[in-house]
């Protein structure tokens, strides 16, 4: 046997009829039979010998670079080593990674009793070569022994599933999912098949769904191996477009949506299946009626005997609310009946229906698994047909950890936590559920969402005033974080701008709660202490004004503060760092801000915001707020700033070294780089011109931008830095050296052209 015949992965091409993984398994079978027959012919082993394919190979599921799991079982106590070597060496020589074992039948039966990995691997074993009758006998006896100790194995198997889930991300929501080990991935399907094989019965419909999900995951994993040319289970961002094309999807968005849908179905069936191992403690308790048509029986939520989903459309929400409130599962027969009988809701909704929806939403986190159960039977879109467009829709960026629909559920759950802080908790959770609904449709998601809610709100039976208030929340759901992170919250013009758009304290109160709920549902980077402080300050100042007070009477933290003013009065250079901020006081000269930005970039530090001020005595002060405290302390940074001011540090050279070292390590982000854009906001501040710069992120970008301002004779009064994946939105409050705003279209054009030339 030529070793190259074992190298099937190198010759893989996508199959158009038979699934590629089955075809590759069949081709491998032929190779293994040929190797086995050649070894038997040469060494003639005594007694029955069989070669079993186990694990994925046993299921005929081989991706191009899958491990080849095989076990050689012999009847006699010993088998000639040369015979075994003749089987394995051609595979090793080909570079194929194999998981192999050699055992007697008796050893195999013994291991079944003590080793879960062996036991589960043999569930899908099949004879590839050798004595087929002997091999099948071994397989059958193993299955019998497995079923005899099924309870013990099921408990251990479930424990392993839970341990893996504790360390793995969810396939449905990760930007780069692990197709095999992630929650809702292939291993979860395998675990349920094993559980079913040893006695934890599953319905035919669930098994059919798992087979369909398994095929999608295999199709993607096979394409991944083919595209990358090496083994792996993590679907990296840079490979998703090519994998989508190879696997037959329209584009990478359709691929990730399909994976989300599949993984969520697998997770739900998995949860339902394993729940039967640990039934509710009060399963035998007497049944109780919880709501019209809804009963608690055997520890689960059931449709009552008199329930009729065909004539009672709101029954589905009463069932869901009862399940969330009691933290119980919906009985599968009841859920199936709701799915098969419930109709699309009429317009307008039945009386009290919006109250039922609000009741479910106010259950908070407990409602999320219930929403997922409803989705498994396509019940959410019967309540809200517009929901279909956001179901499993991916948000492929570094901020959002969830699909659009899951993000909306989570935002509503978070909003319920703020219910006691607002006067209209009902409108808060409704706005939370619908604030991003427009993302399922073409166009600006906020504008589309407003048009959608203009139809949904009246259909729900909301009053005209309530529809208008929810619409305001949807329209401005990004207002507070955008303004807080891109504008100077100590500027009166900023406060007036927000107050004019919000209109009253009730709306501001609701918008603040929605902002927090939305950010917390987005991901860990969307709501940190810095942003929370900025938004809180903005809300506090705006609330003061909306209550009828003068903007001038509000108190806020200014820069420079009293301590910095005292240092400035001394007229000397002073650099001081505390926590995540560094303050620099120095005799004023062009380029100080730029020099500090360059030094911070050399040390790999990200700037969140910065302020600058100079007095009539020619002393300048600036303060930079950083994303994180330097790991090695401030001493080297302070030293380099002094050297940069004195001309002893070549910032350009050091930055070039850092760019050469780190830029090539940068990995692709889902957002992708956007073309540079420069915008002037003349009315955003009463005493400075606000310039907003959108650009692809790069090492030293802040320094490059501020150097252009220096060259153009502009002073920086304030800066806000926001990084979003591969892109940044930097906002600067600028003045001419004379202290005036940047006026005149020609002057602004010159500044803009200089910036765009620098940004490339």
Where are these regions (language model features)?
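Non-catalytic interface/linker regions that flank or bridge core catalytic/transmembrane domains
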Residues: 1-54, 60-62, 66-398
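Alpha-helical phosphate/pyrophosphate-handling elements in metalloenzyme active cores
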Residues: 27-44, 48-52, 192-205, 399-430, ...
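Conserved structural-core and active-site-/substrate-pathway-adjacent residues in large, well-folded domains
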Residues: 28, 67, 91, 189, ...
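Divalent metal-dependent catalytic cores for phosphoryl transfer on phosphate-bearing substrates
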Residues: 60-83, 403, 418-544
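Active-site-proximal structural scaffolding
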Residues: 80, 84, 182-185, 213, ...
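Conserved catalytic alpha/beta cores of large enzymes that bind or transform nucleotide phosphates
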Residues: 96-99, 109-110, 346-354, 358-361, ...
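Non-catalytic interaction/regulatory segments
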Residues: 141, 235, 245, 249, ...
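Metal-dependent catalytic core segments for phosphate chemistry
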Residues: 385-410, 607-621, 628
